[in-house]
From Swiss-Prot:
Residue span of region Disordered: 213-267, 318-346
SMART domains according to UniProt: KH (SM00322)
Listed name of the protein: KH domain-containing, RNA-binding, signal transduction-associated protein 3
Protein family: Belongs to the KHDRBS family.
Keyword Ubl conjugation assigned: yes
Length: 346
């Protein structure tokens, strides 16, 4: 066989028209390989020390002959091809659906099959899935085994398995429709929330304590979370303590506000300090004496610039503030420090 192969290649090369450039190139490459001895089958070894990446491929037959009415290609692809994409990402492999029946347009598939192009040779084979891995030897075989185990689930002709239900839910979500009771929920997977449906809000009771949602049954024996009041059983209280529902009782942990700081500097109410010295007994004596003795002349009344001091200014301010002219004159005599007439001359 090998003796006849090289002469056949040489004869085919001579018979080819020069316009077939790609065919001539391929024939020349094949002749060179055979002459160098690369065409012989050699034993393949795996070097795990160098751990060089290797290419591993395997064809998995799709059982369309046993189950001709089941759409295996649709189940493998999923909505918008997402199922096959996720399967490749999970197994870290490359998967391709090839063979007869892999294309939707049957007329175009037949046309491409008859075209004779190398990339369409797979259309002559049975429908299959090509799994390819490019990784170090140990990891490559591990990925291939994982891929074979996972793709087996997609080759079971079941219309109501978990994969089919998940695909129906995903298709409903992608179409923008609302999920109804006709689409069952996949076990072990969360239900998809449709658009426009708000998330359940967490209600808070009085005092900031988180309350349980209405209709949620808490199993018996479950510990109550911190900060949540238990709804079953009476509220236990110690002897002499008020119940939490009593009105007027401050909540637990309540601290009274600290007393207001004393005014030490001139602030918002600093005008009180200006009138604070006018409320002693000596000031009242000077007010009464000034009103009990009338002014002698107009000059005495207007000549207030002479002998002006802080004590007289405070007394004048208190005169308008307290209006002491309706009081009876004090029986006590004024001391020598104060004058009988605050606006009189010396």
């Amino acid at each position: 066989m090998e003796e006849k192969y090289l002469p056949e290649l040489m004869a085919e090369k001579d018979s080819l028209d020069p316009s077939f450039t790609h065919a001539l190139r391929l024939v020349n490459q094949e002749i060179e390989k055979f002459q160098k001895g690369e065409g012989k089958d050699e034993e393949k070894y795996i070097d795990v020390v160098i751990n060089k990446n290797m290419k591993l491929g395997q064809k998995v037959l799709i059982p369309v002959k046993q189950f001709p009415k089941f759409n295996f290609v649709g189940k493998l692809l999923g909505p918008r091809g997402n199922s096959l994409k996720r399967l490749q990402e999970e197994t870290l492999t490359k998967m391709s659906i090839l063979g007869k029946g892999s294309m939707r347009d049957k007329a175009k598939e037949e046309e491409l099959r008859k075209s004779g192009e190398a990339k369409y040779f797979h259309l002559n084979d049975d429908l299959h899935v090509l799994i390819e891995v490019f990784a170090p030897p140990a990891e490559a075989y591990a990925r291939m085994g994982h891929a074979l185990e996972e793709i087996k689930k997609f080759l079971i002709p079941d219309y109501n398995d978990e994969i089919r239900q998940a695909q129906l839910q995903e298709l409903t979500y992608l179409n923008g429709g609302s999920e109804n009771a006709d689409v069952p929920v996949v076990r072990g997977k969360p239900t998809l929330r449709t658009r426009g449906v708000p998330a359940p809000a967490i209600t808070r009771g009085r005092g900031g304590v988180t309350a349980r949602p209405v209709g949620v049954v808490v199993p018996r024996g479950t510990p109550t979370p911190r900060g949540v009041l238990s709804t079953r059983g009476p509220v236990s209280r110690g002897r002499g303590l008020l119940t939490p529902r009593a009105r007027g009782v401050p909540p637990t942990g309540y601290r009274p506000p600290p007393p207001p700081p004393t005014q030490e500097t001139y602030g918002e109410y600093d005008y009180d300090d200006g009138y604070g010295t006018a409320y002693d007994e000596q000031s009242y004596d000077s007010y009464d004496n000034s009103y009990s003795t009338p002014a002698q002349s107009g000059a005495d009344y207007y000549d207030y610039g002479h002998g002006l001091s802080e004590e007289t200014y405070d007394s004048y301010g208190q005169e308008e503030w307290t209006n002491s002219r309706h009081k009876a004159p004090s029986a006590r005599t004024a001391k020598g420090v104060y004058r009988d007439q605050p606006y009189g001359r010396y």
